[in-house]
From Swiss-Prot:
Keywords: Amino-acid biosynthesis, Aromatic amino acid biosynthesis, Lyase. This is 3-dehydroquinate dehydratase. Coiled coil: none annotated. Its EC number is 4.2.1.10. Homododecamer. Belongs to the type-II 3-dehydroquinase family. GO terms for biological process: amino acid biosynthetic process; aromatic amino acid family biosynthetic process; chorismate biosynthetic process; quinate catabolic process. Catalyzes a trans-dehydration via an enolate intermediate.
Amino acid sequence: MAHLLLLHGPNLNLLGTREPEVYGRTTLAQIDAALVDRAQAAGHTLDCLQSNAEHVLVERIHAAREDGTAFILINPAAFTHTSVSLRDALLGVGLPFVEIHLSNPHTREPFRHHSYLSDKAAGVICGFGADSYRLALEAVIARLERDS
C-alpha cells in the first residue's frame, strides 16, 4: 500500500462554475472523492489539498518527505507558469510527481505554454478535463505496481 498526495493550485476550488467551457462542470469535491475511492480500491491512500497560497503547497510538499508519501500528483494551475518555489520544493523532497492540467495549456494563450515543472515530472497529463486526474492516478497506480 502506498500513500499518495494530490495537490491542487489556485482557483481550482472554483471548478464547476469557473469558465466551464474551459474547465468543465465537475467540482473539485467530485474529483477528489472519485480519486480517493479509486486509490482505496487499488489498496492505496490518497490525501487531497487545494490552496490558493503558494507557500501552503510548498509546506505540504515538504511534509510529504516525512509522512511516507510515495508519489505526488499536482495540478499547479496558474503556478505552473510562475512558481520556481514549487519546482524547488518538488526537487528538494525527491519524490516522483505527475503534473496534471484540465485543459491543454499548449492550445491556450502563449504565456501558458511554459511549465516550471514539466521537465522534472515523471509524466504530464493534460487536456482531458476532469479525466486528466483519473488518467494521472491510473498511471501512478500502474507505475507503483510495476516497481513493486
